[in-house]
C-alpha cells in the first residue's frame, strides 16, 4: 500500500514549496510586509476558484444535473458508496461530450458534485463505473480541491516574489546593498526558474493525489481491478474520441480521472496525472495483494465492449 508514502510525499512537496517561498523572500530583503501582501494576493486569487469550484467546473463542461430517473445506475452506485463512507451524497451531473471521462468537485462533502461524460457511460460496465465513481468520491473526501487550492496559492506567491526580485532587486540587506542584490543574472534566473519550480511541485502534488484517490477509492469499492480496467478503456477512448480543447475543458482537465490531453516526453513533468500504465500497474498490484492471487493487467483487447 502506498497511502502513507503518498501522504508523506505531499507534505514534503508542500514543505519544498514553502522553502522556495522563504528563499526568494530572503533574497528580496526579507520584508514581512512584502510577504504578507503576496500571501494575501495568492489567497484572494485562489479563494474564488476554490469556493465556487463546483459551479465553475460544471459550467465549464456545459454539464447538467440529472435526476435518479435519468441516471438510476449512477445514483445507485454513488448512494451505496457514500453511505459506506458515511458521507452525504453529492449531486450528479452529465456532461455532453463523447470523450470518456469523469470528475468530482466541490469545496466539501456538502457542496460536492460528481460529473460523468456521456462517453464514459457508453464504454464502461457497471463494475468499472463503480470503480471510477469510488475514485472521484475520494477526491472529495480527501479534500483534494482544498489541497489543490493551497498549492495554487503558494505557486502564486512564488511567482509574485520572483517578479518582485526581478523589478525591485534584493531589498535593503547590508550584505547585498553594495552588490546590487543577487545581480541581474540572479534576478532573471529567479523570475524564470522559481515559477517553473513551483509549477513542477504543484503538478507533482496533483499526481500524488491521483495515486491516493486510486488507492482509497479502490479500498472503498473493494475492487481495484475494476478501476484498472476502467482506466484502460478511458485511455483508449480518449485517443479515439479526443476531448475538444477549450478554455473550459482545459480548466477542468486537472480534476478529471484521466488527462484528456496527451502529455508525452518532457511535458509529463507538468502533467497533473501520473502515466496511466503506472496507475494500472499499482492497481493490479493492489488487487493481487487483496486477493492473494496474481492478476494479469488488462490489455488493449479488453477495451471494447461491456
UniProtKB/Swiss-Prot annotation:
Entry membrane topology: Multi-pass membrane protein
InterPro entries attached to this UniProt entry: HtpX_protease (IPR050083), Pept_M48_protease_HtpX (IPR022919), Peptidase_M48 (IPR001915)
Cofactor note text: Binds 1 zinc ion per subunit.
Gene3D superfamilies hit by this protein: Metalloproteases ('zincins'), catalytic domain
EC number per UniProt: 3.4.24.-
Keyword Zinc: yes
HAMAP family linked: Pept_M48_protease_HtpX
Family: Belongs to the peptidase M48B family.
Protein name: Protease HtpX homolog
Native source organism of the sequence: Bifidobacterium longum (strain NCC 2705)
